[in-house]
C-alpha cells in the first residue's frame, strides 16, 4: 500500500544540542586511543621501561654474588673509626693508641666472620619456626644457644 498523501508524518522531537554532538565510538577494552605524537624528528630515542624482577629474584642473585666473593662487606674507614672509638674507652685520656692497618684488618675479618655465622644460625632458627623472615627473637635464640662467648661454631 502506498503512503497516503496529505497525511501528517510523525517525527521524533530532538533538541538542537543533541543533534549537533556526534556520538563517540566506544574503544574496545584493552585498546588505547592513539594521540598525536609529541615526538619531533631529531629527539633522542625514548628508553623502554626498566626491567622489573619478580620479588625475591634479586635477593637470590645478591646471595649468590656474596657467597662467591671473599671481599669485606663493611667499609674499612667506618670500621676503623669504630675500633678506635671503642679502644678510647679503655685507655686514659692522655695516652693515644696507634693502630697497625693489619691489626684493624684482622679485627674486621673476625667481626665479619662472627656476623656471618650469627646470621646463618639465625636463619636456621627462623626456618625451625617455619618462617623465612628472620626476627630479633631468632638472633636472641641463636646467641643464647651459642653460649657466653658466642664463638664460631665451626672453629
From Swiss-Prot:
Location in the cell: Nucleus; Chromosome, Centromere
Function: Histone H3-like nucleosomal protein that is specifically found in centromeric nucleosomes. Replaces conventional H3 in the nucleosome core of centromeric chromatin that serves as an assembly site for the inner kinetochore. Required for recruitment and assembly of kinetochore proteins, mitotic progression and chromosome segregation. May serve as an epigenetic mark that propagates centromere identity through replication and cell division.
Gene Ontology biological-process annotations: 2-micrometer plasmid partitioning; kinetochore assembly; mitotic sister chromatid segregation; protein localization to CENP-A containing chromatin
Family assignment from sequence similarity: Belongs to the histone H3 family.
Start and end residues of each stretch annotated as H3-like: 45-148
Coiled coil: none
GO cellular component: 2-micrometer circle DNA; CENP-A containing nucleosome; kinetochore; nucleus; peroxisome
Record's protein name: Histone H3-like centromeric protein hH3v
Subunit structure: Component of centromeric nucleosomes, where DNA is wrapped around a histone octamer core. The octamer contains two molecules each of H2A, H2B, hH3v/CENPA and H4 assembled in one hH3v-H4 heterotetramer and two H2A-H2B heterodimers. Interacts with the inner kinetochore.
Domain of life: Eukaryota
Post-translational modification: Ubiquitinated. Is degraded through ubiquitin-mediated proteolysis when not protected by its association to the kinetochore.
Region (Disordered): 1-56
Pfam families tied to this protein: Histone
SUPFAM superfamilies: Histone-fold
Biased composition (Low complexity): 1-24
Keyword Ubl conjugation assigned: yes
Predominant cellular place of this UniProt entry's protein: nucleus
UniProt GO MF annotations: centromeric DNA binding; protein heterodimerization activity; structural constituent of chromatin
Keyword terms: Centromere, Chromosome, DNA-binding, Nucleosome core, Nucleus, Ubl conjugation
Keyword Membrane: no
Amino acid at each position: 500500500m502506498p503512503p497516503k498523501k496529505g497525511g501528517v508524518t510523525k517525527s521524533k522531537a530532538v533538541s538542537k544540542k543533541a543533534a549537533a554532538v556526534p556520538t563517540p565510538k566506544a574503544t574496545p577494552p584493552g585498546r588505547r586511543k592513539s594521540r598525536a605524537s609529541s615526538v619531533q624528528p631529531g629527539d633522542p630515542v625514548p628508553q623502554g621501561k626498566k626491567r622489573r624482577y619478580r620479588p625475591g629474584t634479586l635477593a637470590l642473585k645478591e646471595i649468590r654474588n656474596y657467597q662467591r666473593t671473599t671481599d669485606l662487606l663493611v667499609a674499612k674507614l667506618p670500621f676503623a673509626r669504630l675500633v678506635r672509638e671503642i679502644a678510647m674507652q679503655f685507655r686514659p685520656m692522655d695516652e693515644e693508641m696507634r693502630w697497625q692497618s693489619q691489626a684493624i684488618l684482622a679485627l674486621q675479618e673476625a667481626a665479619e666472620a662472627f656476623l656471618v655465622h650469627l646470621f646463618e644460625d639465625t636463619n636456621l632458627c627462623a626456618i625451625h619456626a617455619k618462617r623465612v623472615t628472620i626476627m630479633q627473637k631468632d638472633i636472641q635464640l641463636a646467641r643464647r644457644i651459642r653460649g657466653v662467648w658466642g664463638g664460631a661454631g665451626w672453629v
